[in-house]
Swiss-Prot record:
Ranges facing Cytoplasmic side: 1-90, 144-147, 196-271
Protein name per Swiss-Prot or TrEMBL: Uncharacterized vacuolar membrane protein SCY_4679
Domain AB hydrolase-1: 348-619
Mode of membrane association: Multi-pass membrane protein
């Protein structure tokens, strides 16, 4: 009985089982109660809820699976969208390039941008860069808070530039649908980048959140286990092994660690975005300055009072393609006295055509002086398309197209009927010849001042213009300024109006004109005013002007040269006077020959006067006075000048 009682003793049975378990470690449970238990129910520590722990691991795995599945779908869809956007951008870039600089495709769809410059092309190119970067760096490991901030800033800056453009009436009426959409599209590209960054941040946090919660639990357990003996820790280490990193390590790796390749990619992307930010900062300052200058010169326009001055914008055709800026002084609308007695007959309206790198604001000062001296009764100036305040023309453009546009703007839109005495200076001499030839019915006489010869429109005119010399010039041909043709290739004496800038150089200047740094220095350092920047000495830095010069250069040897030669016969019965610079004739015999040829375009040439001074005769006192006398003799008013 005793033996049986001993055998059935529960305490003894537990002791024996304990001895067996100690002798057979493989039979021990996977979780050691005195190490991983939580709660107050255990002698060695709180008891562990094994079901909850297993359920938590399963939940984390399922959650991460769903998140990563959504992330893969997001990456797949975003790649498709960005590739489509880049394709649209590329097609739009090519279309804009062709439409703005070679052939106006937009007119087929009824669109127009009368404020066209190089800005649209630059913005589209930047949007391509932005979308390409969104595509290449749209990865979880490449998320950067700085990139998100840059995208938001660039998006806001682009919209701010558009707001500045719409702030004043002049630019608001001219930018059109295409120009507006360009700004919105560029802003949308940066907005897409910000959205993608936001999604990357979302997936980053979604992946880290369950891992972070598990990390907190593991941290609490680790804190409790630090109170255990070293022998228990060694036994647990031998029992579980080293294994893979804990969720804590994985979370820290996702949150704080990047590979070297990722750091290089992030740095490259943020550097390019920062350079774009600098570009947009300068672009915004340029837009702000141009907006201020344009407002100062246009907020009182149109001035429709017929006397003593008139200034307004007039369309060039019935389709209202674009407008020319026309300014007149005197009573240019009075045609009633044309049939009166000779003593009461009105003088013809002096219609001045400015040069290639100026407007009437600079080169017509000698005519303005005659008006203030009451030697001429009335005169008109206009800015050619893309110059000054006139609208940007559609491509292509030629001399005949401008002449036809001017006729419509003057006669049909402005109701200024003439008659006119046309005066052309520099490149404007060619425009004057074509306009006069096409409008002999309303032109009384023509005067050419330092006018271009049509041969200057050809590509190789510089070599023929340069005088023979001893090789003291240098254009990089042989070190002595010669090119094997016996001519001196020193071009430094050529005026900027004559020395043609090739298309690539004009294009390069046009791209950089979007920054406007030369315009900024014009008021910061040179203290020039708004008139100087819009149609004065600094006009040559304006993007719209450079685009017009590019259009003129592209068609000069094709369309414009043919326009001048085809209309030459119509000038044979037009009363004409020629004024040439003495310095230019001395420096180039060919220039003198060309000026002589101009005297032969009409059978009624009144005189050929070689005046003192250089090409810009309005800057030389004696040369200016001599030119004024030629004009007064041409219109029969020299007596007024001699009497005074």
């Amino acid at each position: 009985m005793k033996a049986n009682g001993l055998d059935n003793d529960p305490a003894r049975t537990r002791m024996e089982r304990t001895d067996i378990d100690s002798e057979h470690p493989e039979a021990q449970p996977l979780l050691n109660n005195n190490h991983r238990t939580l709660g107050a129910g255990s002698a060695n520590g709180p008891a562990v809820n094994e079901g909850r722990d297993i359920e938590s691991d399963g939940f984390i795995k399922d959650s991460l699976f769903q998140i990563r599945k959504g992330y893969r779908i997001f990456i797949h869809n975003s790649k498709w969208i960005l590739n489509i956007l880049i394709l649209i951008n590329t097609i739009w870039l090519v279309t804009t390039l062709i439409s703005d600089f070679f052939f106006n495709i937009n007119i087929l769809f009824g669109f127009s941008n009368r404020y066209a410059s190089f800005n649209d092309l630059t913005l589209i190119f930047i949007s391509i860069i932005a979308n390409s970067f969104n595509l290449w760096f749209n990865k979880l490991g490449l998320y950067s808070a700085l990139d998100y901030s840059l995208n938001v800033t660039l998006c806001v800056l682009t919209l701010f530039n558009l707001a500045l453009t719409y702030l004043i009436k002049y630019t608001r009426q001219r930018i059109g649908f295409v120009g507006t959409f360009t700004y919105l599209w560029t802003s949308f590209s940066f907005f897409i980048g910000a959205i993608l960054d936001w999604y990357l941040l979302f997936y980053n946090n979604s992946i880290n959140e369950p891992l972070e919660e598990r990390r907190i639990d593991d941290a609490n357990i680790s804190t409790f286990n630090e109170n255990h003996t070293n022998s228990t820790e060694n036994r647990d280490r031998s029992q579980y092994g080293s294994g893979s990193p804990t969720p804590t390590h994985r979370s820290q790796l996702v949150q704080n660690k990047h590979t070297l390749t990722e750091w290089v990619s992030i740095g490259f992307r943020n550097t390019i975005k920062f350079l774009i930010l600098i570009f947009f900062a300068l672009f915004t300052l340029n837009t702000l300055l141009t907006t201020l200058d344009t407002y100062r010169l246009t907020h009182k326009l149109p001035i429709t009072v017929q006397s003593p001055s008139y200034e307004a914008f007039h369309y060039v055709d019935a389709a209202k393609t674009y407008q020319l800026h026309i300014t007149c002084y005197g009573d240019v609308f009075d045609q009633e006295n044309n049939t009166d007695l000779s003593e009461n007959k009105k003088q013809p309206i002096i219609l001045f055509e400015h040069g290639g790198y100026d407007t009437g604001y600079l080169s017509a000062t000698w005519i303005e002086e005659l008006y203030h001296l009451d030697k001429i009764q009335r005169y008109c100036l206009y800015d050619r398309p893309g110059y000054g305040l006139s609208d940007s023309p559609p491509a292509p453009i030629s001399i005949a197209m401008v002449a036809e546009s001017l006729r419509y703007a003057l006669i049909k839109d402005a109701k200024i009927k003439g008659p006119f005495t046309t005066v052309g200076y520099d490149l404007g001499g060619l425009f004057t010849r074509v306009f006069t030839a096409k409008n002999v019915d309303i032109v009384d006489s023509m005067m050419l001042v330092e006018s271009w010869h049509e041969e200057l429109l050809l590509k190789n005119y510089i070599q023929r213009l340069l005088p023979p010399g001893r090789g003291d010039g240098d254009d990089g041909d042989d070190g002595n300024g010669n090119d094997g043709d016996g001519r001196n290739h020193d071009k430094t004496w050529l005026p900027s109006e004559i020395e043609r800038h090739n298309e690539f150089r004009l294009w390069w200047k046009g791209i950089w004109s979007s920054l406007g740094w030369r315009l900024q220095t014009s008021w910061l350092l040179a203290h020039h005013g708004s008139k100087e920047r819009i149609y004065g000495r600094d006009m040559k830095y304006q993007g719209r002007f450079l685009r017009s010069k590019f259009l003129e250069s592209v068609t000069s040897s094709i369309l414009s040269y043919r326009d001048v030669t085809n209309n030459a016969e119509s000038l044979q019965n037009v009363k004409t006077s020629i004024v040439s610079s003495k310095e230019m004739v001395k420096k180039s015999a060919l220039w003198g020959d060309w000026q002589r040829d101009l005297t032969k375009i009409s059978h009624k040439t009144q005189e050929w006067k070689i005046v003192e001074g250089g090409h810009e005769i309005y800057k030389y006192g004696l040369g200016k006075q001599q030119t004024q006398e030629v004009l007064l003799r041409l219109i029969g008013e020299l007596g007024k000048l001699t009497e005074d």
